[in-house]
Amino acid sequence: MQDKIPTIAELRELSLRLLTKIPYLKMLVLFGSRATGNINANSDWDFAVLYDEEKYNLYIQNNPLAAFVIPGILGEIFKINSDKIDIVELNHCSKLIAHFVARDGKVLYEEPGDEFDKFQQRVLLSNTEIKKIEKTKLENIENFLQRWGV
């Protein structure tokens, strides 16, 4: 792997090579600290992927381990350590994670060209919705702790 950290522009250019190895990819987004610029020596690489479900399901039939090799493919093409890569599948993630990807993410690849705009329109939450989700999560944690006598 290289010592040089690739720029967003370099990642966008390199991402065009992904389709040969991930033919069901519709969108790739960098999010988290690398997208916001709040990085440190231990920062990982958070990527969100959106797949064409039909193509993905057909591909998985012949390549059952395909989902597990995505970090390796991204690491190889972007020349970054695959152990530092986290993948979120936007087809199956929580509303809150999808919101943060839509709010803070940097699109590296999308097909068709307005996929990220459509995604943002679908998943961006209002402050009221975020507070409601956070309240529900806190209540769930409190209930769990009470059941365990903590």
UniProtKB/Swiss-Prot annotation:
Signal sequence residues: none
GSX(10)DXD motif (motif): residue ranges: 32-46
Outcome (variant: residue 44 to A): No longer neutralizes HepT, no di-AMPylation of HepT
Domain of life: Bacteria
Cofactor(s) needed for function: Mg(2+)
Name of the protein: Protein adenylyltransferase MntA
Record key words, sorted: ATP-binding, Magnesium, Metal-binding, Nucleotide-binding, Nucleotidyltransferase, Toxin-antitoxin system, Transferase, Virulence
InterPro entries reported for this sequence: NT_sf, Polbeta, TA_antitoxin_MntA
Binding site for Mg(2+) 1: 44, 46, 86
Keyword Nucleotide-binding: yes
CDD domains: NT_KNTase_like
Catalytic residues of the enzyme: 44, 46
Substrates-to-products reaction catalysed: L-tyrosyl-[protein] + ATP = O-(5'-adenylyl)-L-tyrosyl-[protein] + diphosphate; O-(5'-adenylyl)-L-tyrosyl-[protein] + ATP = O-[5'-(adenylyl-(5'->3')-adenylyl)]-L-tyrosyl-[protein] + diphosphate
Reported function: Antitoxin component of a type VII toxin-antitoxin (TA) system. Upon cloning in E.coli neutralizes the effect of cognate toxin HepT. Neutralization is mostly due to di-AMPylation of toxin by this enzyme. Successively di-AMPylates HepT on 'Tyr-109'. In vitro will use ATP, dATP, GTP, dGTP, TTP or UTP to generate a mono-modified protein, but requires a purine nucleotide for the second modification reaction (ATP, dATP or GTP).
Subunit structure: Forms a complex with HepT, probably MntA(1):HepT(2) in vivo; can only be purified when both 'Arg-102' and 'Tyr-109' (or 'His-107' and 'Tyr-109') of HepThave been mutated. The fully di-AMPylated HepT homodimer is not found in a complex with MntA.
Residues that hold Mg(2+) 2 according to the record: 44, 46
Note accompanying the cofactor annotation: Mn(2+) works as well as Mg(2+), Co(2+), Ni(2+) and Zn(2+) work less well. Bind 2 Mg(2+) per subunit.
Lineage: Bacteria, Bacillati, Cyanobacteriota, Cyanophyceae, Nostocales
Coiled coil location: none
UniProt-listed Enzyme Commission number(s): 2.7.7.108
Organism listed in the record: Aphanizomenon flos-aquae (strain 2012/KM1/D3)
Disulfide bonds: none
Similarity-based family: Belongs to the MntA antitoxin family.
One GO MF term attached to the UniProt entry: nucleotidyltransferase activity
Enzyme class, first EC level, given as a word: transferase
Other comment: Part of a locus that includes subtype I-D CRISPR-Cas genes.
Gene responsible for this protein: mntA
